[in-house]
Structures are given as structure tokens and as C-alpha cells.
Amino acid sequence: MTSALVDRPGSLPATSPARAALTAALTIAVLAAIALAAAWYAQLVLGMVPCPLCLEQRYAYYAAAPLGLILAFAAWRGAPRGILIAGLVVLTALALGNAGLGAYHAGVEWKFWAGPTDCSGPIVDFSKAGGLLAQLDSVKVVRCDEVQGRFLGLSFAGYNVLLSLLLAAIAGWGIARTSRR
């Protein structure tokens, strides 16, 4: 029986800095894909329509999943340490930026501050706008300041903050391990 840490022919050495980059990048790619799958499941199967801020929070995952796969492949193929670290820094920045956006959205949901006017401002009276009124009857506006559901006290925005911070920590671990000489 062989251990996962035992070096095998054709594999990265267990102590290789590239192995840490590969592990971090692949973990981030998988978690980003799971987050997107959960968001799309909630939208398509459970009927939870995302607000504009919810959609914006997906962008980081759309970028992190393929970037993580590319970076993992680069680590597996023996890319230079500087490229691996740069890729992990980009993944860290994506995750931290998304955590900030998620915290902002959670604050909007909890009414700590006002959200963007396109999804949480006052409802504008379009009764004098002619045909626009007829169109509004068929369109449901999803507001950013209304939570569609909470689980253990957190909304999707709250869970996004936690997941994004986890991804940043994983990328940070990858940077620290890859930087070792």
C-alpha cells in the first residue's frame, strides 16, 4: 500500500513547491465549480431568482474555476515558481474582492447601508411613461436588499463571504508553501 505522500514515477515530489501550488489551485477550482453549481441549482431548480449583486458575486467563481485548473496544470507541468505564485496571488485577489462584495451585499440585506439604486432603491412611478407600465406588469424586479432565504442565519451572500475567505486562505497557504526554498 502506498501513501499519497510517497513519490511515484511521473508525479511531483511530496515536498515540491509545485505540489502545494497544484493542491491549492485544484482545490480552489473545485470549490469554485461547486459554488457555481449550487448557485445555478438554487436558480434553476429551486426557483430562487438572483439579484444583480448575486450575479456579480458569481464573476469571481467564473474566473477562479478555469484559472485554478490552468494553474494546477501549469504546476503539474513544472512551471516556474514565480508564475505559480503570481497565479495564486490572482486567485487570492479574486477571493478577497469577492468576500468584500459579499460582505457589502450582506450589509445591504441586513439594512446596514443602502445598496445600489438599480436593485435596492425606491420604486419609481412609471405610470406616466406609457408602454413601460405594461412591461412592468410582466417583469419581477429582484431586490438586493431582500433575502430570499437564510440557512443557520446566513443568506447566500453571507455564505459567499465565508467561502471566499476560505478560498483566499487556501491560496495564501499555496503561496506560503510554494515560496519556500
Where are these regions (language model features)?
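Short, Lys/Arg-rich, polar N-terminal cytosolic tail immediately upstream
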Residues: 1-21
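Generic alpha-helical transmembrane segments of integral inner-membrane proteins
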Residues: 30-37, 66, 70, 90-96, ...
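Loop-to-helix transition at the N-terminal end of transmembrane alpha-helices
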Residues: 48-63
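Structural signal for the C-terminal ends of transmembrane alpha-helices
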Residues: 70-78, 172-179
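Extracytosolic (periplasmic/ER-lumenal) interhelical loops and adjacent juxtamembrane/interface segments
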Residues: 110-155
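A hydrophobic membrane-anchoring alpha-helix module
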Residues: 138-181
